[in-house]
Every structure is written in C-alpha cells, then in structure tokens.
C-alpha cells in the first residue's frame, strides 16, 4: 500500500506583498510569499523516498484553506527512455538515465472538481495549479532564505508587448455542418475506450536552444520534463496518453536546417526524422524545440492529419525560456493539428479565455481543448486508421514506478482506476482498491458491457476501408487489434 505523505505549508506574507518583482515567469505585479514547511507522517520503519509517489499539501490562497493532492506522473517516462547529445566532433552519445524517482507531479485541489495542478518538486515547488477557475503559479524565491516561495495569479504576470502570435497551420475545416457541443467528462465507457491513443514522443532541442542555455544539458532536460509533464495533463481529457520515450540535444550543431522560415525548418526536420531518428529510436511523433524566432510571428508549425507518417509526424515549436506552460500549450496545439484537429471557431469554448486550438496565441495560455476539438476528435479521428501507430499501449511495466490507486491510470496489479472515490463514476470499479466490484468481470474495455465480458464473436471495432473487424474473445474485456488488411 502506497503511503500518502502529508505535507503542511504554512503561509507567511512579507510586508512587500503586492509590489512588483521579477520572477521566473517574468515581471509579476502582485504576489504572496509563502514558506512551505514539510511535516512527514511516514510509518515507523518505512523507507523514505527522495520523491514520494503521493503527497498532500495544505495551505491557504487569498486567506482560504486549500488541500492540494499530488501524485507522481507515471506516464512521463517509458522503460526504454533515452537521452542523446553529441560530442564536439559530432559523435553521438546516448544514455539511459534512471527515471524511477523523478520529481514531476500532477494534482488537484480537494473539493474543486475543475482544478488541476502540474508541479515540479525537484528544488522546492515550481509549477501551476488551477483553483476556482483561476490559474496560479508557485516558484521558489531566490533569497537567502531558501524556504521562501512566491504564489501569484497568471494574470498578474506582465504580458509581452508585441504583435499577436500565430499558428502556422492554415484553417481547413472539412465540414460546414454545425458543431454539436460535446462534454469532455461525460462520455460513455465504450466511447472512452474507442478514443484511447498512446503517443510515444521524442523531443529534440536544437543547437540554438543549447547555446541560449549556455550548453547546460541538465537545465534543458529539466525544461523539457516540465513541458511534457504539462503536455500529458492537457491530453488526458482526450484519452490520449503522451509518454516521453526520447530526448535529444543537438549540442554540436544543427542536424537539420533551422531558418527564419517555419515551413523550411519543418520540412528539414521531417526529413531528418525519417532518415535518421526513425532508424535508431522507436517512437510515434517528434517535436523540435527551437531557439529560432520565426518570421511572421509564427510560434509553431506541423502537418495536418499526418500522425504516424515517417516524414510528417513532426512539429516545431519556439522555446520561450521560462514560460513552460506557454510552450506546452504550443506543443499541444501542434500535436492537435497533427492528429487532425482544426483551429477553433468563434463559437467554440472550453471554460477559459482561450482554448488549445485557438488560431491566435494568447498570452494567457489555456490547458484545455474546446468542445469543438473534442467533437471533431469524436467524429473524425476515431473513424480513420492513419493513427494506427497510436493503438499500441506501452506495457504497464514500462512506466517504472509503483502503482498508485486513484490516479486514473490502470497499472500493474490493478483491474481498473476510476480516480479518487469521490470522483469515481464507474459502478464496476471499486475506487478504494482499484479492483472490479463483487460479481463484476471487468470495469473497462471495448469488450466490457455492464461489468461483464461481451460474448465471443461480438464486433468491438468495426472495419473501415481495407481493415477487418476486430472481434471480442469472450474471455477478456480487451478488443484485440489485429492490425492487418483484409
């Protein structure tokens, strides 16, 4: 049984609360200074991990008490995760770092169903959390008192004074039919199963980025970890699991052409991916994170509906140094296009000022896809087989840390995971144990109906094009994916 660590944060506010200060995210006009004080409650004799699997923080925001639940993001790395950089003479150096005890977490605020959190606990607490619809950031203050942290609203960060930033993908709605609003949280179980995809992602930092960060490979890696930690959370409502399978730093020079033209840079990166990266690293999609400032206020570029294509399952995104959430938003946007999702129309909404697939990049980035994006994903993406490379779920043993019941991800030793007991809506799953309820055979899967295995011969995935029907076996809740042509 995973022990939950209880950590209490005591808040103390300096007299200069409300004054301006330069923090990692930029110039902040209003902030609170807090002192996290850790109080552990591990059982006697328990082994103390460097970074616990589950943590709980209690603190106050604007004078109101909140409880922040954090769980280690076990979807961040895969077992065959590797990192590659290059010696000054261009020699490839690949390592397989131990990532079991990493320090990147997802979380939620107790009694706030719409809350989210993405936190790095590597050196203090750094990241963001959404509380009562507002985005807050937290980060350590660089003071002699190392325990001091700043908490502030995203809206209090001074915005860049420049022309509106744009996505490089041209609007191309395939249908002029009215968009039917769709909920991201109330899909029937069989539809949730049909939507599941698994993106094994490689992120490449170009030589310009390497130079900007003074050749600090450790810092660059940490930045990419933070970005992908946010990215995995963004895609969860679409039932897409993003796992970082590789990280590459072009430390000796650019390995594909990087220019002011986003189109030329994208094309060159796609060619490099097809001819070089695909031959030495198994993955589904690659993103180039670059220090180049593209012409025309372009922030990113990708190919529309080309996921799984050897040359075109790629994207490029401009780095913004300390604005991790902004970069994660852009990477999610380009991934969305590569999956086939269009820009949002004016009528689309996600409960925020802007959504992931907005054509214009907001200075206050969203972490949510709109109802239109989900509707298009439901209506189009699941009906085509060009994303077949995303069907192969990484082995549950690939995510190399012990299971935690209640994190929505079914891990080794679990039959199901419908989240915390207060949030679980699956009558076939016992949220307290992550086992099927008494009398149930299953709790999830395309071949599971009302907690029972569907009969042998039942079609669980209808043939499209030249593909055959997939058929239930009667012995399992999983829908076999034969993956062959008829």
Swiss-Prot record:
Domain (Peptidase M12B): residue spans on this chain: 197-394
Cellular component annotations (GO), alphabetically ordered: extracellular region; plasma membrane
Major location category of this protein: secreted
The UniProt record lists the keyword NADP: no
Cited InterPro entries: Disintegrin_CS (IPR018358), Disintegrin_dom (IPR001762), Disintegrin_dom_sf (IPR036436), MetalloPept_cat_dom_sf (IPR024079), Peptidase_M12B (IPR001590), Peptidase_M12B_N (IPR002870), Reprolysin_adamalysin (IPR034027)
This enzyme's EC code(s): 3.4.24.-
GO molecular function, one term: metal ion binding
Active site: 334
Motif extent (Cell attachment site): 464-466
All residue ranges annotated as the Disintegrin domain in the record: 402-486
SMART domains named in the record: DISIN (SM00050)
Tissue: Expressed by the venom gland.
Role, per record: Snake venom zinc metalloproteinase that inhibits ADP-induced platelet aggregation (probably by binding integrin alpha-IIb/beta-3 (ITGA2B/ITGB3)) and degrades fibrinogen.
Similarity-based family: Belongs to the venom metalloproteinase (M12B) family. P-II subfamily. P-IIb sub-subfamily.
Assembly description: Monomer.
Protein's name according to its UniProt entry: Zinc metalloproteinase-disintegrin VMP-II
